[in-house]
């Protein structure tokens, strides 16, 4: 992927984007809030504002009478304005109602942020061009583990209905624990005492996928129900919040997956090697609870307990025909058509397709709990303690079962298949066979793969314990307002393993073929989207448990062994931070300056994939000093310049740290030479290395970056008007090359190796090389961000004043080149251009809005062969959502709201491609539009 950004083009696009933002910009998200919600500025009723004294004006900041979506905007912009850091955030429009159906969708509308979709829904985010692994997640300020294989947060684990705010720090401060290199997303639930009144809110939504139910027995409808109860007791010293969210959401998709593209003919034209087109029907079922207990018996003592528990199930069937073409025994007829070096149409003979009935599922349990205690010794000193747990247990299953006309290529009836490439890069076919014929197709091994099917059961456990202690000293000073210092200690353990087995016929007979009994058959599945009328269908799990099939373990396969690992991280963070509140030449200046000292003990263990029963283990200890500074200067009325500088880190991907790999080979020649000369292994001299292996690198150091941010913000008009421009730069002191080599310690498996006699006495012989990820020290990232929020009530009164627009656009470039290479390396998650536009209207209870978020091509992580994770080029997309609703504010229906939403209104596809060539489409997935009709009631 070309990551060289052209700032000439950027300036042109910026000019256009700024003009567009001034005219067509609006937001359905909220911006920033500081760590203490008491400092947040929110829109309040006019009577509350009138009661404020002159001394309260600085805290109120242009309160206006708004509600719903506009209240969300006003709250956000007010807190962005008062924050000392460079931040973005989302605020709930009302209890249990964030602006979008998912957290990730709302985050993707923030300036400089974007999302990657999975099965049609936004799942993980990138912040300022850096992928999901560079952004950490907190829940109420506490670090969270992840359901994925690595560090990237899958935000669909957290129901948006249970959250009141999501704050994204683009520039950290020293008191922010668990901070990411790109950004830190802090998910927040309601504080019942801060909420200040009894509230009961319930909602229900009906969901419909317009693409239809593509697999027999699947659903294209679903639901979401939520409820929240907030109350205060004992003269407002005890507060409670209880929330519940349950959903059953269908996902229907037409999927095209190519094998790849070899070349053919004298001109080396690209030709489809094979394909796996499917229709996929899944159902996401999630049940979640959240609770908060706040107790403040005296003004000096405060304590709270937070708990969030979520069970997440996402499972369903994929049915399609795997079509081996150029990479099989099939033959391409002469006379095929080509265009621009690509074979676009032709006919294959002797095609033996694999009719597949697959099942894929995920079951994840999320638990987050925390206890916080604060005590004021006096008006100068405050002590705080916080104890927390974050845990995710995930179990996946991936089952595939095959049907065909005969076992092994050349046996059974073959097909003659015409093909034609479509304008979107996928293909359609014309078949001579009837793939629904239950007298022709049976359980077998059509391509001679040695199996009737395969089953994988990956399992991941991730758990983190944290303890934080801090002490704050307040000052009556015109420069330093307070100083905070403290310590944070975390222990994290993540493990992964996979149980896998071949699926074979229990009684294969002589032909390894079994017609499917009628009681296991389902209605046929249509494959019209690829030109094939249909295929036979059955329930793969019911068939697996029928006695017709058996499972044959594949646990000792080297590829399976490599999927098992354990990573442990113990991290001690000491920090100190001074908060600044002063004036310089009459200009108000607020901010902070501080430093973190981070000490990490990192270790990993995992099996050797070429020696059953042998475990490799290694690790490293390291420390880093991370200074930070944030300054906010109000250079004119409602006009701010912000400056931030920080050194940040992001620990490497867990699968890169994982110790699992092959037993190293022994270079006998080098060992004998060192024995003869009395020499020792010198890790800096490859000629003296005796042991050479491959796999992960438990000694991998983190990504380290020095960053500078500069932002200009002008606020005007009502509480929801502003424009901003920001520039940022990060220089990487340390980066990770996934395909390099490094030195690790093989002491744990030295006794399992066959060494020349006496070689174990060679000094440092245990230090050997591993081919895999390694650190290098070169790279940078920089970008520009522009945003504007323009409410129409700046210009007109009355109903027309209900219009508003928000737009943002970001341009980012990177230049990251490994030490031993000359070509820059693409950064995961980096789209050179990211933007969004939202137009909204709200007046007298009626509201409507339409939003478009877009991003250019990028390198993203997807699930690859064998359920492993791999990086792939992903085509940029442009997603349009819309919603309309009405809220009753008086009468018998006061508090009742109805809403209709449409997600992915233009049916934007998800596309990946190979070899930096957009013509070589790997995945093409179409999801259709999802509609939600809902009603909510608050009292």
Predicted regions and their residues:
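C-terminal beta-signal and adjacent terminal beta-strands/loops
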Residues: 803, 854-861, 886-939
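Short loop/turn motifs that connect adjacent beta-strands in outer-membrane beta-barrel proteins
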Residues: 176, 192-199, 234-238, 300, ...
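Transmembrane beta-barrel wall of Gram-negative outer-membrane proteins
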Residues: 217-330, 334-336, 361-378, 629
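Gram-negative outer-membrane beta-barrel transporters
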Residues: 727-736, 740-741, 747-863, 936
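Short acidic/polar hinge/loop motifs at secondary-structure boundaries
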Residues: 142-170, 220, 227
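Extracytoplasmic beta-strand/coil segments of soluble accessory domains associated
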Residues: 104-143, 170
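Outer-membrane beta-barrel signature, preferentially recognizing the C-terminal barrel domain
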Residues: 358-366, 563-569, 649-724, 729-732, ...
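N-terminal periplasmic "start-of-domain" segments of outer-membrane beta-barrel proteins
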Residues: 65-98, 124, 132-135, 142
